[in-house]
Amino acid sequence: MISTRAHGFQRLFTGMMGLLITLTAAASKPAPLPPEQADGWSLRQEVDNVRIYTMEREGSSFEAFKAVAELDVPIENLMAVMINPESCKEWVHNCIESYAFGQGSFQERYAYSVNDMPWPVTDRDYVLRIQTQGDATTGEIIMTLNAMPDMRAEFNSRVRVDRSDTHYRFIPEGERTRMVWVQHTEPNGALPGWLVNSLIVDIPVKSMQALEAVAKHNRYQNHRLQWGDDGQLQGVAPAGR
């Protein structure tokens, strides 16, 4: 009985952390994310090819995290995954529903997603604005994700999360890609900061490892980046198009 109960609590806490990491929403006046190269980052853990750093944030009980990984896939594969509005279910831990909505473009588009929570915690949903930009000179691609919680009606069976900032940067290194993921979240509900901060490592590690594996699937092979005359990224398409 003790073992079963402990397992239940572990799954509950892991589910809560999945919410904090994958739900990417912005407050009306969010504090800016700490820069990637800020002095305050402290290495928290290194798991295989993923390194997790954390940093305390002034006025917040919750730490920011930075995850850095050397992924053994080319940037074209990764971007083919990232532009798929349903790919959240493939690589983001605990994401069970995801789809695009609205009249978006490659540079600015919208998605709705649901994060599975273990009973008795209610599933969380979120509405995202996803902005993507790339520079042909460096080959780097940056994605920022912020919530627009009022763009879609809420469901009684789900709780909408409305505060977080996320930044992805993809740096091509030949047939490999360096990925940097920075996030700071102020979660809804009465979750103590000490608990969240103690579990902040697990979810980004699992998600980035899954992303590397998913990007090797056949459906994400043989894509190319489409650059405009101004050197800005315009889209991602199969190589034959």
Question: Where are the regions that the model predicts?
Answer:
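Bacterial N-terminal signal peptides that target proteins for export
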Residues: 2-16
